[in-house]
């Protein structure tokens, strides 16, 4: 391994030297690390709720501009740091809409933590009033999320969950009290869950906005791991220019104990917290929780340590009674990404499974009974993109016809299939929230 590393370094140095001799610009570490060489594409498209419009942040990170899905033309500027009332910042990093589309959460001063997690100072922007105001004065927040009625925001600070009520002068209350670094984490995953299961938030509101559910991670028994921090070039850590620092976090190596996880619900009116118990192996995982459209019904996903058995429980978040409604097993491995392909509708939910040898789209009712297998054949469904209730039409991305390419398809109630993209290559799509339009992204070798 040392020889390979040395050979790699020598090759890089030789390549850089050769480039310099030939008058070619040398590669710079900052350029490599910053994404300078990424292919150009349209980025940051955010579909607006209940509409055929989308938004983008401008390159200067000073405006949020509204566009039409139908024409691709700019319609209006929804937010501008120079004209918004009481705006004290000059740039912002990201944003999200409330479910009713009347408000936005705008993130500033973002500080990355791990691959997906970050802290930021968030502001609440009311579009009609053109008014910006701090979400909280208590310090940076993680994973702020609107309630379905758009009148509350939950977030995490210092491993505890907080709740802001927008109808009560943005009053803030603390939901959990036991959060502590390297011991108890509420509402956000530990490093292992974030890295292995690809998510950074473990908070969800009930459909009536009266309950809040979250995962608690107890990593008290997990062994710590430390590594040195140096000044560096990109990013720079000036505090460690003279003497290196140390970063310590809980890191369970293979075969060692993981964090103990539990699911809890919080009644916002009564302020009662309940633990919801589901059958799970001692070393099992809870990679996601999500409220369904049915009031009080919480979906809890569990995986065994080998990650080849996925269970879906539906729990009553008030009574804490749970029931197993779906189990999917694989001889090898179940990709955790399939959990994000599960979308709950009032009477049904979608599910991707390899149970017949290929990853296909399945349609279940809310009790876990299979209604139908939507797609079949010697190909795979890569992504479920949506279901139109009015026409009973499914939209998805598939590699049918060529395993090296993907296309966007729709299939109606009579199983009539239509290809929606014509160009050969890897096709991706972002749909409007009404499913009336989509933006297609094509990647090809030519």
Please give the residue ranges for each predicted region.
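Surface-exposed loop and turn segments in beta-propeller and other repeat-based domains
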Residues: 29, 33-34, 77-88, 173-195, ...
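Signature of short aromatic-glycine-proline-rich micro-motifs recurring in repeat-based ectodomains
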Residues: 40-45, 89-96, 188-208, 288-289, ...
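Non-catalytic accessory segments flanking enzyme active sites
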Residues: 42-46, 53-64, 76-78, 93, ...
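Residue-level detector of Asp-centered blade-edge/turn motifs that repeat once per structural unit
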Residues: 49-50, 99-100, 148-149, 207-208, ...
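Beta-strand C-termini and the immediately following turn/loop, strongest in propeller blades
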Residues: 54-60, 68, 96-99, 105-116, ...
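Predominantly five- to eight-bladed beta-propeller fold
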Residues: 72-74, 109-114, 118-121, 175-203, ...
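Blade-loop segments of beta-propeller domains
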Residues: 73-111, 131-142, 329-332, 378
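Asp-box/WD-like beta-propeller blade repeats and closely related beta-sheet repeat scaffolds
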Residues: 116-163, 168-202
């Amino acid at each position: 391994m040392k020889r390979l590393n040395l050979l790699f370094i020598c090759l890089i140095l030789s390549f850089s030297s050769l480039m310099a001799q030939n008058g070619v610009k040398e590669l710079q570490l900052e350029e490599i690390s910053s994404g300078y060489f990424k292919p150009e594409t349209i980025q940051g498209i955010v579909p607006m709720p209940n509409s055929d419009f989308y938004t983008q942040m401008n390159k200067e990170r000073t405006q949020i501009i509204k566009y039409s899905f139908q024409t691709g033309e700019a319609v209006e500027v929804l937010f501008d740091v120079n004209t918004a009332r009481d705006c004290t910042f000059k740039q912002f990093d990201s944003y999200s809409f409330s479910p009713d589309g009347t408000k936005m959460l705008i993130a500033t001063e973002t500080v990355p933590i791990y691959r997906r997690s970050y802290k930021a100072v968030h502001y609440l922007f009311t579009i009609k009033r053109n008014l910006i105001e701090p979400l909280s004065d208590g310090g940076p927040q993680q994973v702020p999320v609107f309630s379905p009625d758009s009148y509350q925001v939950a977030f995490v600070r210092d491993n505890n969950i907080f709740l802001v009520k927008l109808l009560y002068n943005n009053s803030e209350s603390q939901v959990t009290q036991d959060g502590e670094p390297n011991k108890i984490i509420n509402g956000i995953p530990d490093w292992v869950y974030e890295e292995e299961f690809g998510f950074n938030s473990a908070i969800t509101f009930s459909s009536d906005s009266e309950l809040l559910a979250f995962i608690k991670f107890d990593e008290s028994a997990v062994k710590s791991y430390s590594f040195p921090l140096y000044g560096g070039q990109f990013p720079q850590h000036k505090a460690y220019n003279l003497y290196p620092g140390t970063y310590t976090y809980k890191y369970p190596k293979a075969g060692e104990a993981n964090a103990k996880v539990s699911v809890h619900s919080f009644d916002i009116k009564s302020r009662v917290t309940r633990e919801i118990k589901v059958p799970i192996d001692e070393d099992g995982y809870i990679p996601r929780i999500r409220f369904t459209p049915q009031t009080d019904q919480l979906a809890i996903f569990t995986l065994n340590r080998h990650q080849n058995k996925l269970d879906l429980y539906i729990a009553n978040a008030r009574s804490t009674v749970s029931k197993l409604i779906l189990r999917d097993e694989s001889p090898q491995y179940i990709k955790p990404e399939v959990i994000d392909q599960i979308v709950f509708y009032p009477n049904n939910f979608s599910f991707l499974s390899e149970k017949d040898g290929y990853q296909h789209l399945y349609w279940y009712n809310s009790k876990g009974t299979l209604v139908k297998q939507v797609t079949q054949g010697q190909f795979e469904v890569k992504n479920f993109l949506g279901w139109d209730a009015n026409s009973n039409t499914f939209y998805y991305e598939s590699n049918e016809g060529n395993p090296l390419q993907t296309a966007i398809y729709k299939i109606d109630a009579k199983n009539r299939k239509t290809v929606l993209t014509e160009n050969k290559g890897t096709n991706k799509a972002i749909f409007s929230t009404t499913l009336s339009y989509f933006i297609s992204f094509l990647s090809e070798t030519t």
